[in-house]
Amino acid sequence: MGLAVKTKKFLARTPLHRPLLELNSARRYRQVMRTPIRDVRTAYCISPYKTGASFIANMFDPSVSAHEPLYHLTLKHMHNPDFLQRRKAFLDLRVEAFGHFAIMAKEFSVLFPDVDLLFTIRDPSDWLGSCLDHAAVMQQRIHYHFGGKLFWRKVTRYASNDFYRLGDEAQCEYVTDMLNFWVRTYRTARTLPKAHIIRLHEVEEKIEWLEDLFNQKAVNLKHAHRNNSPGRK
């Protein structure tokens, strides 16, 4: 692990985490909003968080594929159509995995009617457990839990990193909210004209189908599970 990575991880656990994120996002926001809107043929994997999106993004060349690029900035402005159009042109990707767009799948489909949208289905109990475990891990790794504040509070009545501190009734409400989100997402996906739905365990069996869908050759299958896409900040 290089010094820059060690420094970044250290700062993420300090009170400097949020101001540094905000400064970086403000700089990137200006860059994005100066980008002219143009047609970029990006296909998206927007199934809910923790459904294999990083694996799918990382199997393709990182020069044309990314997992959750401009992460903090996108969560702040994901309901702004002008930002999303300029962001698409700014990133100039062919494949993007950003599961948080699942919460606005219908609006996303209307904004980009010619774009293919991939949804992967994971068993809901496995998915929920993975989300909870990830939130617990991130509780130890970062000081500012912006994912919970900017996204998960739109899904549940509680921040995602609070689950193991909640009482029994509140935990039941949290689980209900999460599973309702899971159901809504795939019900919506079935109504979208350019949506494609596959089960997570089928992904590695359908590499050629994914290559055709994204019009890209899979080049990185050996290391696809590593979340090493550039630009995830």
Segments and roles (model prediction):
Residues 111-133:
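Conserved phosphate-donor/acceptor-positioning beta-strand/loop module used by diverse small-molecule
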Residues 89-93, 165-178:
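Surface-exposed cleft-lining segments at the edges of enzyme active sites
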Residues 53-57, 103-106, 125-130, 136, ...:
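Short catalytic/ligand-binding loop motif for oxyanion handling, primarily in non-cytosolic enzymes
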Residues 72-81, 124, 188-233:
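The conserved 3'-phosphoadenosine-5'-phosphosulfate
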Residues 1-92, 143-173, 218-233:
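PAPS-dependent sulfotransferase catalytic core
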Residues 45-47, 95-101, 120-122, 199-201:
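Short His-Asn-centered micro-motif
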Residues 82-115:
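Conserved nucleotide-sensing/catalytic segment adjacent to the nucleotide-binding pocket
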